[in-house]
């Protein structure tokens, strides 16, 4: 969709917002239905949202970044979708985008260790077709290369000894 196009009933649109409070950032995204959407669009949105929570459940102190990506990727691919690889989640703190990168694909037990106090954004971007995307000339708009539907959900979480804590519930 071109940024000049108007949204119509049946479209889905992703909105990604950041906020800053007392010098610290938060990052949150969701995909919304414009009116009634096709069963395919609803299923894609539901799968993407649930893959976010699969990733969050895998974000345990002592685990690895790859555990998160593997949880997201396994859930998504088991349902016939693909995970965008060009964009990933990230650390969050005094800057909106910090290390470490948090891919939505990966191998369990690989990557940096998750430690209590780490704050990260997990943000699966899931395509109904292939995983390739293209950035439009405006430098912001991203479309799937094959024209398929895509959905995106994100939460900022803190790793704690008692499990992950979601910081961006709205």
Over which residues does each language-model region extend?
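Active-site neighborhoods and metal-handling regions in enzymes and metal-associated proteins
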Residues: 1-170
